[in-house]
Amino acid sequence: FDDGNGFVQYTVELPELRLVTIDTLEEGRHGGAFCEQRAAWLDAELAKDGAKPTYIVMHHPPVESGIEWMNTHADEPWVATFTNVVRRHDQVRGLICGHLHRSVTVAWEGRTIAICSSTAPQVSLDLRPIDADHPDDRPMIVAEDPAYALHRWNGRELVSFYDHAGSHTMLAKYDERLQPLVRELKAERPRQ
């Protein structure tokens, strides 16, 4: 998947949807990166089909999450470079990201960013400011069940489901007692 410039970037063409995967890794940096070479590749890739709904898949989200030590700030140069490319392409419906080890949904530039939790330990959901000079014993990484996202294209929108890979206690099952509810719900919908 090398794009010819040493970055792992590629496009998946589906019948009704495009997924453009970009490399936001920079050696020696924890946060994201997006240089002019990557910007040129993304701009050219997006220009190939301006009509088909497209989602950009990337590790680092270009937004502040509220988990301060994991934030990406809007004034970081790579964010401006990336944002300028995306603004030129109206077919980009949203972004699919990771990095935060926490499920987050963000409205960004008129698009939706879906950020998935991790299949490894999670980042603690702590929205307090953090002082780099004064450790305060807050939890930073927590042992929650591994998590994942399932993205489903319904022909109009991308629908994202988030779940944890642990066992779940069943509270209700589809049996004769719930059959009337299911029938009522289906009767409310247009026939297909």
Q: What name fits each language-model region?
A:
Residues 1, 64, 71, 130-133:
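Short glycine/proline- and charge-enriched loop/turn segments
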Residues 1-48, 53, 78-91, 109, ...:
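Extended active-site neighborhood of metal-dependent phosphoesterases/phosphodiesterases
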Residues 23, 55-58, 91-101, 114-116:
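Active-site neighborhood of phospho(di)ester-bond hydrolases with catalytic His/Asp-centered motifs
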Residues 23-25, 66-70, 126-127:
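Short acidic, glycine/proline-rich loop/turn micro-motifs
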Residues 27-30, 61-66, 93-107, 121-122:
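Active-site environment of divalent metal-dependent phosphoester hydrolases
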Residues 49-66:
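Short acidic, glycine-rich surface-loop motifs adjacent to enzyme active sites
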Residues 62, 66-87, 92, 99-102:
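A contiguous binding-surface segment within folded domains or other stable secondary-structure elements
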Residues 85, 107-192:
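Binuclear metal-dependent phosphoesterase catalytic core
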